[in-house]
Regions:
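An amphipathic, hydrophobic-aromatic interaction surface with interspersed Lys/Arg
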Residues: 1-236
Length: 236
């Protein structure tokens, strides 16, 4: 059914309309749907997963709401913490309201252009408000947001970012088993925000939550590298 709906959406976007051809509409949809197997991965245990592996933002706007920039460039640490919590909850329980909440966190009003803000600043006290105003977003777009954020989370723990002209990999920051799925990892983000705040690098807990996600992770990576260097030095 999902393949048929997606095929219908794609065909409509290409100008196809029922009745344009002699072939029955359902036959056209069925044939198109069969050609979309490359979009999903099917596992032996029956699990079907969308094969999406990109951090490029393909839905920068929906109506007047703006989403994150490509590669999570403008995500704050606090915004990411809350988005990840909703993403994990939806992955485990498949509750529609959790998916809506995820989209509400990520898609907000335009920011102050004079300050160079793409989106308005994230406010954790407005979580319910964010969800209420984004609830009319079509389900297929919500799934797209979920797919993008899921892919970003995987890339965050495995991929390489280019920051200030340097390649940076945050994999050492995340302790994970090879058997664990990215969503089952114990990232400990709630404890991280307090430990980073104690260092005073970004300021208070709120300041740390408002700091860019990638900058906070760079701080954690630096701490990890220093700890590893000290551990090796002590073994000599």
């Amino acid at each position: 059914d999902v393949k048929r709906k997606w095929a219908y959406y794609v065909l409509r976007g290409r100008g196809w309309r029922e009745g344009f051809r002699a072939v029955e509409p359902l036959v056209v949809l069925e044939n198109a749907a069969k050609s979309l197997d490359w979009m999903w991965k099917e596992y032996e245990n029956g699990v079907i997963e969308l094969a999406f592996d990109s951090t490029e933002q393909l839905l920068p706007k929906w109506r007047r709401y703006r989403g994150p920039k490509s590669h999570g460039a403008d995500l704050t640490f606090g915004e990411f913490r809350h988005a990840l919590a909703y993403c994990n909850s939806y992955t485990q329980e498949h509750r529609p309201e959790m998916l809506t909440a995820l989209c509400g966190v990520l898609y907000r009003n335009a920011g102050n252009s004079k300050l160079g803000q793409w989106r308005e600043s994230f406010n954790a006290n407005l979580m319910q408000f964010y969800g209420n105003r984004i609830h009319k977003m079509p389900d297929y777009l919500k799934w797209g947001v979920y797919a993008w954020f899921s892919s970003f989370c995987r890339f965050l723990t495995e991929g390489t970012f280019i920051i200030d002209g340097h390649e940076v990999c945050f994999a050492p920051v995340f302790s994970r088993s090879k058997r664990e799925d990215v969503f089952d990892q114990s990232l400990g983000l709630n404890s991280i925000v307090f430990s980073v705040a104690e260092s005073g690098v970004f300021g208070s807990v709120k300041d740390t939550d408002d700091a860019p996600l990638l900058r906070v992770l760079m701080k954690l990576l630096d701490d990890h590298n220093k700890a590893e260097a000290l551990r090796k030095e002590m073994k000599k």
